Structures are given as structure tokens and as C-alpha cells.
Amino acid sequence: MAGKDIKYGVKARESVLIGVNTLANAVKVTLGPKGRNVLIEKSFGAPTITKDGVSVAKEIELKDKFENMGAQMVKEVASKTSDVAGDGTTTATVLAQAIYTEGVKLVAAGGNPMEIKRGIDKGVEAVIAELRNIATPTKEQKEIAQVGTISANSDETIGNIIAEAMDKVGKEGVITVEEAKSMETTLDVVEGMQFDRGYLSPYFVTDPERMEVIMDDPYILLVEKKVSNMKDLLPVLEQVAKMGKGLFILAEDVDGEALATLVVNKLRGTINVAAVKAPGFGDRRKAMLEDIAILTGGQVISEDLGIKLENVTLNDLGTCKRIVTDKDATTIVDGAGDAAQLSSRVKQIHAQIADTTSDYDREKLQERLAKLIGGVAVINVGAATEIEMKEKKGRVEDALNATRAAVEEGVVPGGGVAYMRWLDALEALHLEGEQELGKKILSVPLKSLFVRLPIMLAVKVLLLLMQLRSLKDQTVSTQLPKFTKTLSLQVLSILPRLPVQPCKTQLLYPVCFSPPSV
């Protein structure tokens, strides 16, 4: 049995601090709009190029177990920030490093760790209140594009594509990032509800050139169980045929005699019909069928509800403006469901998202929500090589996360101004004893940021600090050029491009880390 190494007091804190500094120093080179790229070696394949702090942090594992504990703590800060806000991981790492360093000094000098921690907590509350106070909602597409552009390394193309996607699908819509097959980065927006199930037989195709089933104003039959017996379908088929409309069948499966008869009737021109398997599995399939029923104004045919297929009437069928189906996917456009019921369903799914503790379930619920409101966009990232593709895709994902955070909780002044307001909030808070020392710890990370940010911008620290401290107005995009006339030309060109930052990422920085009391 392997023995355990045990360290106490100063030696333990020093080892942990080495680990904290090792990881943080590797991560913080990526800070800000002029941050550097990091090249990460892989055991197989090409290396990875990234400017994402959490991606760098996740690759670091130190040989010394005590030092590695410090590195893992800071890694957790970056990971937590990434999970909740999606961006701002490098800034969170720099702040964590500074807070730990100062906390260790106070503990080594005989400070009470618990009182110091209470001071930090009270300072955090004041900072969060101030950040929420100065946050403003993002209303215009231009503001969203600014946030996306900044997070994508000042790439305006990416910022504009993300803003366009957000504008088209809304804040509840799903935006996914995929690798393109060409060198161009493009945006594809899917109208209506789309799910990954295609037609059960190619004989249903109405457009042979595109191999698609296109149905205008069809009736939609939603069946929870498998349909194999044709006699169950005959009554509803006869009713639909009399109306001279098409019938789209969505069921667990359609096979055997039922599928064969539908194909024959389609080929003879008796009725325009198509059948597709219902999306999902188990309880998720039932939920999605109910979503489609509400969207189209229909009723799910389920024996659990006492409704049999042979007793279905036209009132039980849903309708929509158009359905397009190929061999892989189906899109329902402009369902005829009741707006009030749809709104109620959306609220119900929102509540389920808030209650769930599973990331997988949350993702699936968000997909359902996006499908219901008809918002699905795909950003196809193009590049010349695989290495460039991965790097660019990472920037797009970062920018998308920052944009979502900005839309969700608003934006705060960028270019370091929000940190100055952070400092003002701390100065206005008066605590006693060692809690005051804990509160002051939170002002130290600002110095780390103001040393690091100008290094990336190649300007003098004190000049930048003085200019930002004098800037109190929230309308930074118009005020910054006025206050930066004495700075170098490089700052004049960069700072106006940093008008806003997502408030959500700022709120997380002070709460992700506090110094241990070892």
C-alpha cells in the first residue's frame, strides 16, 4: 500500500501557490482582445491552437501532487465559469490567482481565515450589486455584434454572423456550430420545427429531383403507438380524401400492411400521404409528440387517453402551412396551434429547465424549446486546414457563449471600466477588523488585470489606470475616445472596440474562488 505525503502550514500553502501560479501564468497570456494564442501538443494528430483559457487549463497536469492540487483548484474556477457563463475564463483565472496569493499572505501573517473569508463574501455581494446596477440590456443587433466581435478576437465576420443568427432565431432559439465542408463560414437558419426523422418510404417523394416530400396545408395525424393494421387507418383516410387534402402520419412506426397500403394509394393518386417515425425515444418521444400536437393544433392519439385510432375525426388532426421531409429530417412550418396553449407549453418547459439537475436533460429540453418556437440556426465554420478549423471553431463557440450571456443578463462597460466600478463599490463598503482585510483582497485582482491588460495592449499601466478611473459614464462607446487622447495610437484604435462586456461573465469572477485556510 502506497504511503501518503502530508504537509502542514507554510510548506503546504507554498506548494499549492506554486501550482496556482504555474497554471494561471500559462492561461493569462490569452487575456484580452490582444491575447496570445497557445499551442497545445497532442499525443496523436496535429497540435491544437487556442485562445480559450479553459481549454489551456484543462490540458495542465503537474507532476508534484501538492502543486497539482493548486492547479486543479484554479482549473475548477475556469471550468465553472465556462459552464455557467460560457466565456471569461481567462479573467476568472487571473482573479483567482491574485485572490489566493493575497489570501495566503494574510493567513501567513496570522490572520483568521474565517474572518477573511467573510470579508471576501461581503465584498462579493457589494461588487455583484454594483455590476447589476450598471448593466444595460442588449437591444440592438449592433450591440450583439460588438460582443461577438470582441470575443472572437475582433473578427467582425464572426460577430455579424452570430448577431444575425440571434436576430433570426431569438434568444430562446438554438444556435449550433459545425464544421463546414468549404472554406467559407456561413449561416443556415431553419424555419419551423425540425427533427431528425425522414420518410419511411421513398415512394412518398413528391419532388424526385430533390428527393423530398413537400405537402402544403396537410392534415397531421399523431399516433403514440406503432401502426401495422390498415383497418385502423381506413376511417381517417376516407375523411381526409373527401376533403381533398394530404395526410402526414407521425407515429412510433408504420410498417407491414399499413405502410404497403399507404404506398399503393399514394402511387395511384388516391390520396397524397406520407409517414414518418416520431422523434425521440420513450418518455421524450411522448413529450415531443405533445409538443407537435400543441404546435399544429392536433391531438396525440393514445390509448392511455382513451382515444383509439379507428375513432379519430378531422378535429383530432393537426394542420400547418407546409411540411418538408427528406430521407433524414422533417420540418413543420407555421403550425396552426393555439397561441395561448403554445405559450403555456413554453413556460412549462422553462420551468423544467430550471428544475433539472442533469446537463443532458437540460440540453434536450432547450432543444425542444427551440423547436417549439421555430428557432434553429447552424453556423458552418470554414477554414483551409484542420488546425485552423479547430481554432476558428473555438473562437466562434466562445463568441456565441459571450453573446448569449449578454442577451440573457445585459452588458457592462468594457475596456476595464467595469472593474473601476467594482473598485468604487468596495471602497464604499466599510467593514471591521479582519473582514476589512478580506474585502481589500478583492481590489488586488484589479491590479493584476491592469498590469496584464496593458501588457497585451503595449501601453503604460498608470496612464490607462488614470484614464479609466476618471471615466464614470456608462456610455463607454462614445466616451472612451474623449478620455484616451493622451494614450498611444494603439490604445486609441483598440479601446473604442471594447465598448461592452457580458454582465454574466463579470458577475461570476468574484464568486468562483476564495483562499483555502490551510
Curated annotation (Swiss-Prot):
CDD domains: GroEL. ATP binds at T30, L31, G32, P33, K51, D87, G88, T89, T90, T91, G415. InterPro entries: Chaperonin_Cpn60_CS, Cpn60/GroEL, Cpn60/GroEL/TCP-1, GroEL-like_apical_dom_sf, GROEL-like_equatorial_sf, TCP-1-like_intermed_sf. The keyword Cytoplasm applies. It holds the Pfam family Cpn60_TCP1. It is an enzyme of class 5 (isomerase). PROSITE patterns: CHAPERONINS_CPN60 (PS00296). It catalyses: ATP + H2O + a folded polypeptide = ADP + phosphate + an unfolded polypeptide. Keywords: ATP-binding, Chaperone, Cytoplasm, Isomerase, Nucleotide-binding. GO terms for biological process: protein refolding. One of its GO terms (cellular component) is cytoplasm. The keyword Isomerase applies. Belongs to the chaperonin (HSP60) family. NCBIfam families: GroEL, PRK00013.1, PRK12849.1, PRK12850.1, PRK12851.1. This is Chaperonin GroEL. It comes from Desulfotalea psychrophila (strain LSv54 / DSM 12343).
